[in-house]
From Swiss-Prot:
It comes from Mus musculus. This is Protein mono-ADP-ribosyltransferase TIPARP. Residues 1-10 have a biased composition (Acidic residues). It comes from the Eukaryota. It is found in: Nucleus. One of its GO terms (cellular component) is nucleus. ADP-ribosyltransferase that mediates mono-ADP-ribosylation of glutamate, aspartate and cysteine residues on target proteins. Acts as a negative regulator of AHR by mediating mono-ADP-ribosylation of AHR, leading to inhibit transcription activator activity of AHR.
Length: 657
């Protein structure tokens, strides 16, 4: 409650804007002044917009921006500023029910209309859907039928499989749940502590029309202004301030008045200028790169580029050297949490350096090691994972380091409202990716080939089709690959689906033949999805001719002279030779492992199941360990199919800010 006097307020008349004057206000004062009266007036609270309201308003905003309807409502504060300039509405009207005089100019929301002539337009976004946290258990372990959008060849040009492999129409509508998943990062070196966001929206959202039913034009516009205010990004210059988790979830009611940082991600990097001592944000394109590199405990220094000059940043001391333009670096983050399953909190990992490098330990053990170092103890005893450990500190003091758990934008998309996610739909338990065997694609009776395949001309032996990030197959492959290959060391560039009709037919018929001799669980585990590392020069050959056991021995033949496949991508990475451009190549293949036995170096084929019988069936594959196999060796080329090609690269130690 607040006390207010009822002195008559002058009427504010807002004139249309003109180049010569801004927001002129004509005052009409009455001739008589009434006596002052004391009264009580309840302070109005800011409206709280729910997640559903925020999502339903986006198509309205998009329509207004595209049509230019807001050109007379919003204008740039400074026409000479760059694309990060703030925008404000010309008719200055606050969002309270009772209007008052125009507020201060710095209280308006950030908005860039589509019609604004901005140098350096935002790039096209590639949205992604239903992205669980890395390690989220996959309920359906199959690579499901997908819809590949885009232009494909005309089906009338071929006859090979008129009723089997259907061409995919280029007019397939994009799922409304997929469209607004990704924000377009603004290019440029620094954003002036303010960020802009542009969504690709589905204007057919029925919630939008329902939301504005029975509302006047003025009330609807106020609701739009309220939304814009809540979507504004800002950072503060002071240290010790955390990122607002309510804003990440789309529930912060304070807008630009929030005392916490409003950023796109749960982490945000800034660098301080030496002359002004002001913190400025690193370019949006570099935020994830810098975070990815920082999360690796092996990295202490990072090379930075800005304005044609190179300099270095110390990631431990958070200082910048070999330049006079900047002197410090800082990382803004959300509050810490001891639960790694929390998407919005920062989870810190603790590392201790030994003879073999940086080894991760629980925080309690690290604290114990720190205490032993400070007291000069020669050894530390502790129990971890039901085992007793002894660390000897006789010859050196153990170095301790902490780094945050890395979460990529791809993983964060469905959880963050700032990236267009839907937290209510993505609130799944965050656990390690299941190691269960992935079932094969469901092939309908009307289509012998996977429904995800696009049309290919009969003259083509094979094609490689890029997998969209919103496809479920992409997410499954992403989680399988990064289950053993750290995200902070390697980054997936592209995933290609291999379509080879001849090899697919051979593989399916061999699978049917093997299944006839199996029953129950044996049929389920007959087919596995395994990794195979290789070099760029043989990728196309494998896509056309398949994995050839006859050319084995290029890397290893310890368990037999055949084609090698591994459960873990980290093992296959050892045989993935880097190309001249720094790109690695790895296959995720379908493999019919069937019945297996221990392999040996001299085997050119699997041994018989019954050695005493001449007509005995042979084992289908050989393994490195009978009880917990990690490596499978195949001796027949019809027992495998090159399903996907994964292209990835090592995280660079240089970032352009």
């Amino acid at each position: 409650m607040e006390v207010e006097t009822t002195e008559p307020e002058p009427d504010c008349v807002v004139q249309p804007p003109s180049p010569s004057d801004d927001f002129s206000c004509q005052m009409r004062i009455s001739e008589k002044i009434s006596p002052l009266k004391t009264c009580f007036k309840k302070k109005q609270e800011q409206k709280r917009l729910g997640t559903g309201t925020l999502r339903s308003l986006r198509p309205i905003l998009n329509t207004l921006l595209e049509s230019g309807s807001l050109d007379g409502v919003f204008r740039a504060r400074d026409q000479n500023r760059d694309e990060s300039s703030l925008h404000e509405h010309i008719v200055k009207k606050p969002l309270e029910i009772n209007p008052s005089c125009p507020p201060a100019e710095n209280s308006m929301p950030v908005l860039i209309p589509d019609g604004t002539n901005v140098e350096g337009q935002l790039p096209e976004a590639h949205p992604s859907t239903d992205a669980p946290e890395q390690g989220v258990p996959i309920q359906d372990h199959s690579f499901p039928p997908e819809t590949i959008s885009g232009t494909v060849a005309d089906s009338t040009t071929g006859h090979f499989q008129t009723d089997l492999l259907h061409p995919v129409s280029g007019d397939v509508p994009t799922s409304p749940d997929c469209v607004d998943k990704v924000m377009d990062y603004v290019p440029g070196a620094f954003q002036d502590n303010s960020f802009t966001i542009q969504y690709i929206l589905d204007t057919s959202d029925k919630l939008s029309t329902e939301l504005f039913q029975d509302k006047s034009e003025e009330a609807s516009l106020e609701l739009v202004f309220e939304l814009v205010n809540q979507l504004q990004y800002h950072t503060h210059q002071e240290n010790g301030i955390e990122i607002c988790m309510d804003f990440l979830q789309g529930t912060c009611i304070y807008g630009r008045d929030c005392l916490k940082h409003h950023t796109v991600l749960p982490y945000h990097w800034q660098i301080k200028r030496t002359t002004t001592q002001k913190w400025q944000s690193v370019s949006n394109d570099s935020q994830e790169h810098l975070e990815r590199f920082y999360c690796n405990p092996e990295n202490d220094r990072m090379r930075m580029k800005y304005g044609g000059q190179d300099f270095w940043a110390d990631l431990n001391a958070m200082t910048v050297f070999e330049t006079t333009e900047f002197d410090q670096l800082r990382r803004l983050s959300t509050p810490p949490c001891s639960n790694s399953n929390s998407i919005y909190h920062t989870f810190w990992k603790f590392f201790c350096r030994d003879h073999f490098g940086w080894r991760e330990y629980p925080e309690s053990v690290v604290r114990l090691i720190e205490e032993a170092n400070s007291r000069g103890l020669k050894e530390v005893r502790f129990m971890m994972w039901n085992n007793h450990y002894i660390l000897h500190n006789s010859f050196f003091r153990r170095e301790i380091k902490r780094r945050p758990l890395f979460r990529s934008c791809f993983i964060l998309i469905p959880y963050l409202q700032t990236l267009g996610g839907v937290p209510t739909q993505a609130s799944l338990p965050l656990e390690a990716t299941s190691s269960q065997i992935i079932c094969p694609d469901g092939v309908t009776s009307a289509n012998f080939y996977p429904e995800t395949w696009v049309y290919m001309h009969p003259s083509q032996d094979f094609i490689q089709v890029p997998v969209s990030a919103e496809d479920k197959s992409y997410r499954i492959i992403y989680n399988l690959f990064h289950k053993t290959v750290p995200e902070f060391k390697y980054r997936i560039l592209q995933i290609l689906r291999v379509q080879n009709q001849f090899l697919w037919e051979k593989y399916k018929r061999k699978k049917e033949y093997m299944n006839r001799k199996m029953s129950g669980r044996d049929r389920i585990i007959n087919e596995r999805h395994l990794f195979h590392g290789t070099s760029q020069d043989v990728v196309d050959g494998i896509c056309k001719h398949n994995f050839d056991p006859r050319v084995c021995g290029k890397h290893a033949t310890m368990f037999g002279q055949g084609s090698y496949f591994a459960k873990k991508a980290s093992y296959s990475h050892n045989f993935s030779k880097k190309s001249s451009k720094g790109v690695h190549f790895m296959f995720l293949a379908k493999v019919l492992t069937g019945r297996y036995t221990m392999g040996s170096h001299g085997m050119r084929r699997p041994p018989p199941v019954n050695p005493g019988s001449v007509t005995s069936d042979l084992y289908d594959s050989c393994v490195d360990n009978f009880f917990e196999p990690q490596i499978f060796v195949i001796f027949n080329d019809d027992q495998s199919y090159p399903y996907f090609v994964i292209q990835y690269e090592e995280v660079s130690n240089t970032v352009s800010i």
